[in-house]
């Protein structure tokens, strides 16, 4: 949120709450008084919850910067009341409108048998239009115009309020595309934005809302107000524009005004400015004051009557879940178990009534019935995902998102795998339902990895492009079984996915029935390559389509290249490959293999005669053979040899035999089926590799799964073959699984636990499954047995069925040789046995395998190098060795393929041995594998119903629906869900789950009946039963218990959060104190170290100086002066000066001292080794001759080894001068030459004169100095001259004016 909450003022300093006015959408509204001037206002108190931040800021910005207008509520400011416990409150202080809303006024009048006068309605609408015009002129769309947002003042003023969802338009964005508002007042174009992402709207959406408000002013409620708000989103776009309930009771202008506001095409809808010129509104403009007084009188009259309860219609927003406050509004017909009368006619009536209202979902207890609407509905947007997130099921209408949410909540709450079983006939909507479940589970399990979520959402689209096709009854029929497992962490975050595929209908690649098509991907890739001008690269023709996709009409090629949907789907498939993580080389290899399959289908064969009268075959169109070989990167000669001949190994000898035309065509088609089947398995395995969970996030033991079964539905065509037999057997197995969980296991536990419950009769299909799957006399076992006989034919197969399958479920029609009938749970089906044996054998010659393993396409090599599993798919273990990387797999590297090829060429019998698995055995193992995955999870059933066979929207065929209800056991399910107990939980598990509801957290209640009773009574549940070891609950009991447990756990989490926050703050405080203490310790240590370092440096420098001084002193006694008359006396004076310091005589003149030795006068400074200067000697009164000074300096220069090399003016000399400052404790140097005496006498005279002219100081300003001060002891009246920078007066050795200090005076 951009608002700085802490910077806002505290409202308690200015405002005082007087009373509660009402309740808004997201907070209460109070009347407040200003503490300073007593003025009244209204305040809307909002909690700063994260999902309202956007609205708060939008409303604040609009109110703050919008200029004032008589028909827009005034804004006094925003305040923030801090509260650490609840997070603080925002106060929006607005103008007080004591008249209430127009909705309250109209309802109050209608309650008294009255209604608003048309003139007053016109006046209210006129004020609202002026307010909207003011907003629109400032590029603001209100987007929530309704009666509750039009307030009245006691003087009859009309004010627009509530700008929480208003939109600010800009010069570059004059439209919006967010679906937001209150459903009853939302315009059709606003609702359309949920489903149609290219839709948008402008300010005229407020005109539609105003038209609905006009109806509300007349009738008291908006149209269809009794409906659920979510249902209204279905109705508004489809229904004609609403009108008043009794249009004849109102004037024509009012009806016309409403009709103009409610034009569904907003481009033709008038604007607010145009509506101000409408006759119904224009007649008000000259009567504003009169009508205002009339409205004020009506308000005054209403004030004396009883207040009317306010009706709030919550607005809906894409960014926020919508919750219905009153759960009791849930319609009874939402759940068929609640119906008083339970029979077929009643159930069909309610299903048809709901379907007519576009309510396609209905509950049967905890089972969901979904009717295919055969149209796009706008009920699957993110807004609805938020709507069905962790709420009570009865709070919202039935929805597939509710079933997904139920499975997710059970997963997180009980840490147990879940299984969602979607079943129904072909064309009933199972695949789309699976899409929606994955979409909602991905939303619920939001992970930090956004890429992973996008990958999972793309998986279904990619797999269905390769595994779905158009059939006679379904344009997007699944031609394989798919079990998608979504993996979650213990906290509920999605972390990966895995697909298991079963029984791909490979025979569709080579042949399709009348009115059907091949797999979608062939049309997508052909159209995509055509528009990319790449057909020639993949050796595909541009004029005549390949035989596998040619179809029956001659316009196939034109349809493929001209259909925009095919090209769009191809681009979508490319996007899926990229998002999921396929490498570009992998995708290119996939395209080459698909193109190779299409080219193989175009190869033709012709018979040729030979000398030995043996049928042979040849390829009359070598260009097709060359194209296929080129795309597959194999030799055309080897391919032709593999198609037209085969090798037989007998007693160690290899015999090459020619293939007949029919056998060559079978080999060609078998090669195409094997290529496509193995390519499909590789794509699935590759997806599993790219979506496998990260082991660092969660271990395999802690991982939880939600399985989604989307399997081909029950089929009954005009011609049913081996594929339909396998599909229907699989549906029989799913129906048996449903019966076991819903009926058999439940009633068995009634008997074992001694529970008195009504037993429901149901149709058990176990005998039929035994007829199919038992050994050795089951149908599939007999089929495998006959397939192993080389002389076996389709006729002998049917005879064997008739001889061994003697039961009521099997019959053989008379007059039809190769047919047999099966009485399935969904009805009787007649099967054609032609080609069943060959399809079951699914023979692929070893010569074809060898040729394909020599391909230069590394992916193609891999497809025929990896062995097949018992379910007929490529083994994942081998793929992990070569495809463990998430980018480009290593099998694309050079040199690796030849090793695999040579390794597997030695064992071609893996794929060609007659003892290998048949299609029936693959099918049997596939069912076993599928059931082993399903039984580990808690099941959730979704029964899809096909309302008609014509695939027309909103057309309901009672006979077709009733037949499906009977076959799936829905009627019996309603009875057992009403009378039975769908949840049976052991005492120990029940107490472990729910003991928080009745016991304290530290308590450990025993797992017995008493504890269970305490929990159930504390939860205020009824109609439960206790058995010997289990608690028997209704389907709705578990939901109520889970909601109560979630509330308790929410409070626990809140308490833990506060505690953890307090502990964290305390740890932080202690860590901060410890850190500060450590910093002080470090700083102290550093300061000590630095002080010791500096002291050590000073000590070192002193030591060096002392060493230097000792060196100089050692050379002093050996100094020799030049002969001079005063030499002896000077030495005597030297000794005297060393022994006796200078003392002042009685006259104040210092006594003379002998000059010390070692004074360097040439360097211009006092030698620190001697400790005295020549100037000090002069002050003492000793006459120092120039010759003496000269010879002394000379002697010093000769006898000072440390300065012997220094020359005046050199850098060494300069540094030496700088290193000789006067010591701090040394006495002032004194000069006493005659010239100095004269100079200082003149100076003293000047100072005395200046002192006489200066005003005397006051006594308080005079500083009394101690006569014992050390400075004054050393300083005599004749020695008050400041220290010279030179040791000896310059004229002793130089006459240069620059060096003479007196020359400046």
From Swiss-Prot:
ATP binds at residues 21-29, 44. InterPro entries: IQ_motif_EF-hand-BS, Kinase-like_dom_sf, Kinesin_motor_dom_sf, Myosin-III_kinase_activity, Myosin_head_motor_dom-like, MYSc_Myo3, P-loop_NTPase, Prot_kinase_dom. Residues 331-1046 form the Myosin motor domain. Residues 1048-1077, 1075-1104 form the IQ domain. Its main location: cytoplasm. In the C-terminal section; belongs to the TRAFAC class myosin-kinesin ATPase superfamily. Myosin family. Keywords: Actin-binding, ATP-binding, Cell projection, Cytoplasm, Cytoskeleton, Hearing, Kinase, Motor protein, Myosin, Nucleotide-binding, Repeat, Sensory transduction, Serine/threonine-protein kinase, Transferase, Vision. Its EC number is 2.7.11.1. Residues 927-949 are annotated as: Actin-binding. It is found in: Cytoplasm, Cytoskeleton; Cell projection, Stereocilium. Probable actin-based motor with a protein kinase activity. Required for normal cochlear hair bundle development and hearing. Plays an important role in the early steps of cochlear hair bundle morphogenesis. Influences the number and lengths of stereocilia to be produced and limits the growth of microvilli within the forming auditory hair bundles thereby contributing to the architecture of the hair bundle, including its staircase pattern. Involved in the elongation of actin in stereocilia tips by transporting the actin regulatory factor ESPN to the plus ends of actin filaments. It comes from Mus musculus (Mouse). Disruption phenotype: MYO3B single knockout mice do not exhibit early hearing impairment whereas mice with a double knockout of MYO3A and MYO3B are profoundly deaf at 1 month of age. Cochlear hair bundles have abnormally long stereocilia and show dynamic shape defects during development. This is Myosin-IIIb. GO terms for molecular function: actin binding; ATP binding; microfilament motor activity; protein serine kinase activity; protein serine/threonine kinase activity. It comes from the Eukaryota. Interacts (via C-terminus) with ESPN. Interacts (via C-terminus) with ESPNL.
């Amino acid at each position: 949120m951009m608002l700085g909450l802490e910077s806002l003022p505290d409202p308690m300093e200015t405002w005082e709450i007087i009373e509660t006015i009402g309740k808004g959408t997201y907070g209460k509204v109070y009347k407040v008084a200003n503490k300073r001037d007593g003025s009244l206002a209204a305040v809307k108190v909002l909690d700063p919850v994260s999902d309202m931040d956007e609205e708060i800021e939008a409303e604040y910005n609009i109110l703050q910067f919008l200029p004032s207008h008589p028909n827009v509520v005034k804004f006094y400011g925003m305040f923030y009341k801090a509260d650490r416990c609840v997070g603080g409150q925002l106060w929006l202080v607005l103008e007080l409108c004591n008249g209430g809303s127009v909705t309250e006024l109209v309802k109050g009048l209608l309650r008294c048998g009255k209604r608003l006068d048309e003139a007053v309605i016109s006046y209210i609408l006129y004020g609202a239009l002026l307010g909207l015009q003011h907003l629109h002129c400032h590029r603001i769309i209100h987007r929530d115009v309704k009666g509750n947002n039009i307030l009245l003042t006691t003087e009859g003023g009309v004010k627009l309020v509530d700008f929480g969802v208003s939109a600010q338009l800009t010069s570059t964005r004059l439209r919006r595309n967010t679906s937001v508002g209150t459903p009853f007042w939302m315009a059709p174009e606003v609702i359309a934005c949920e489903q149609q992402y290219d839709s948008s709207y402008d300010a005229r959406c407020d005109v539609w809302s105003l038209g609905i408000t006009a109806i509300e002013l007349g009738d008291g409620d908006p149209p269809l107000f009794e409906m659920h708000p979510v249902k209204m989103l279905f109705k508004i776009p489809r229904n004609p524009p609403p009108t008043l309930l009794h249009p004849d009771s109102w004037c024509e202008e009012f009806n016309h005004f409403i009709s103009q506001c409610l034009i569904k095409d907003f481009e033709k809808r008038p604007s607010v400015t145009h509506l101000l010129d409408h006759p119904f509104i224009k007649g008000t403009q000259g009567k504003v004051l009169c009508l205002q007084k009339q409205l004020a009188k009506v308000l005054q009259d209403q004030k004396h009557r009883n207040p009317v309860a306010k009706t709030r219609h919550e607005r809906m927003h894409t960014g926020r879940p919508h919750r219905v406050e009153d759960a009791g509004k849930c319609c009874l017909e939402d759940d068929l178990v609640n119906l008083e009368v339970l029979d077929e006619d009643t159930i069909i009536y309610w299903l048809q009534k709901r379907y007519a209202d576009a309510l396609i979902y209905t509950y049967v207890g905890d089972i969901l019935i979904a009717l295919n609407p055969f149209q796009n509905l706008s009920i699957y947007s993110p807004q609805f995902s938020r709507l069905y997130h962790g709420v009570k099921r009865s709070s919202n209408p039935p929805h597939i998102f509710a079933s997904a949410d139920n499975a997710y909540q059970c997963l997180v709450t009980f840490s147990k795998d879940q299984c969602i079983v979607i079943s129904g006939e072909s064309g009933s909507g199972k695949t789309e339902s699976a899409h929606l479940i994955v979409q909602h589970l991905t939303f619920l399990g939001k992970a930090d990895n956004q890429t992973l979520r996008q990958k999972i959402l793309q998986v279904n689209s990619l797999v269905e492009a390769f595994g779905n096709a158009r059939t006679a009854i379904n344009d997007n029929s699944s031609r394989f079984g798919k079990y998608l497992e979504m993996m979650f962490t213990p906290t509920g975050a999605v972390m990966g996915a895995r697909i298991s595929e079963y029984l791909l209908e490979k025979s569709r690649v080579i042949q399709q029935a009348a009115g059907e098509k091949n797999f979608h991907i062939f049309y997508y890739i052909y159209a995509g390559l055509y528009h990319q001008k790449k057909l020639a690269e993949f050796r595909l023709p541009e004029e005549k389509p390949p035989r596998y996709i040619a179809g029956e009409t001659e316009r196939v090629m034109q349809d493929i290249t001209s259909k925009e949907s095919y090209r769009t789907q191809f681009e979508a498939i490319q996007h899926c490959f990229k998002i999921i993580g396929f490498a570009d080389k992998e995708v290119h290899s996939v395209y080459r293999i698909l193109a190779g399959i299409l080219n193989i289908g175009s190869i033709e064969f012709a018979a040729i005669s030979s000398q030995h009268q043996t049928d042979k075959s040849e390829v009359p169109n070598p260009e097709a053979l060359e194209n296929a070989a080129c795309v597959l990167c194999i030799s055309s000669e080897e391919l032709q040899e593999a198609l037209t001949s085969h090798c037989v190994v007998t007693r160690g000898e290899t015999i090459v035999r020619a293939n007949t035309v029919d056998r060559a065509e079978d080999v060609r088609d078998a090669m195409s089926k094997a290529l496509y089947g193995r390519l499909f398995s590789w794509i699935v395995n590759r997806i599993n590799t790219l979506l496998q969970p990260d082991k660092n996030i969660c271990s395999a033991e802690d991982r939880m799964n939600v399985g989604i079964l989307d399997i081909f539905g029950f089929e009954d065509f005009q011609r049913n073959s081996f594929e339909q037999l396998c599909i229907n057997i699989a549906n029989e197995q799913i129906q048996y699984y449903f019966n076991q969980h819903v009926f058999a296991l439940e009633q068995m536990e009634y008997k074992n636990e001694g529970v008195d419950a009504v037993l429901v009769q149901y149709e058990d299909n176990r005998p039929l499954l035994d007829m199919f799957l038992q050994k050795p006399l089951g149908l599939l076992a007999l089929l495998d047995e006959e397939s192993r006989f080389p002389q076996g034919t389709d006729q002998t197969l049917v005879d064997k069925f008739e001889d061994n399958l003697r039961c009521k479920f099997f019959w053989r029609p008379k007059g039809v040789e190769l047919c047999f009938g099966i009485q399935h749970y969904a009805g009787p089906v007649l099967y054609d046995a032609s080609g069943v044996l060959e399809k079951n054998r699914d023979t692929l010659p070893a010569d074809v395998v060898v040729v394909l393993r020599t391909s230069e396409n590394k992916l193609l090599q891999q497809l025929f190098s990896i062995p097949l599993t018992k379910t007929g798919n490529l083994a994942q273990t081998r793929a992990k060795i070569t495809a463990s990387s998430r980018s480009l797999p290593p099998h694309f590297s050079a040199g690796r393929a030849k090793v695999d090829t040579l390794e597997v060429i030695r064992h071609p019998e893996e794929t060609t041995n007659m003892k290998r698995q048949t299609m029936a055995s693959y099918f049997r193992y596939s069912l076993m594998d599928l059931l082993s995955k399903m039984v580990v999870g808690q099941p959730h059933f979704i029964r899809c119903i096909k309302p008609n066979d014509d695939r027309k929207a909103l057309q309901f065929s009672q006979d077709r629906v009733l037949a499906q209800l009977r076959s799936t056991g829905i009627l019996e399910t309603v009875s057992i869900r009403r009378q039975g107990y769908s949840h049976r939980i052991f005492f120990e598990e029940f107490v472990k789950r729910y003991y928080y509801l009745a016991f304290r957290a530290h308590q450990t209640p025993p797992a017995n009946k008493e504890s269970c009773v305490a929990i159930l009574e504390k939860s205020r549940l009824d109609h439960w039963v206790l058995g010997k070891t289990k608690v028997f609950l209704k389907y709705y009991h578990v939901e109520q218990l889970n909601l109560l447990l979630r509330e308790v756990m929410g409070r626990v989490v809140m308490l833990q959060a506060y505690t953890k926050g307090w502990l964290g703050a305390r740890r932080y405080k202690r860590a901060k104190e410890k850190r500060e203490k450590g910093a002080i310790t470090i700083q102290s240590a550093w300061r000590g170290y630095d002080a010791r370092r500096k002291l050590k440096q000073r000590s070192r420098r002193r030591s060096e100086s002392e060493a230097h001084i000792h060196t100089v002193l050692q050379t002093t006694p050996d100094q020799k002066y030049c002969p001079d008359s005063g030499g002896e006396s000077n030495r005597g004076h030297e000794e005297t000066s060393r022994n006796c310091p200078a003392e002042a005589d009685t006259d104040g003149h210092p006594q003379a001292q002998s000059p010390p030795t070692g004074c360097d006068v040439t360097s211009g400074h006092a030698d620190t080794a001697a400790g005295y200067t020549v100037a000090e000697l002069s002050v003492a009164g000793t006459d120092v001759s120039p010759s003496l000074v000269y010879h002394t300096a000379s002697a010093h220069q000769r006898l000072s080894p440390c300065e012997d090399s220094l020359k005046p003016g050199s850098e060494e000399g300069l540094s030496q001068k700088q290193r000789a400052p006067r010591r701090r404790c040394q006495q002032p140097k004194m000069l006493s030459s005659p010239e100095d005496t004269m100079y200082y006498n003149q100076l003293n005279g000047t100072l005395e004169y200046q002192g006489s002219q200066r005003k005397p100081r006051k006594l308080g300003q005079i500083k009394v100095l101690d006569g014992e001060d050390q400075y004054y002891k050393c300083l005599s009246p004749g020695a008050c001259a400041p220290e010279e920078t030179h040791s000896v007066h310059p004229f002793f050795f130089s006459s240069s004016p620059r060096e003479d200090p007196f020359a400046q005076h």
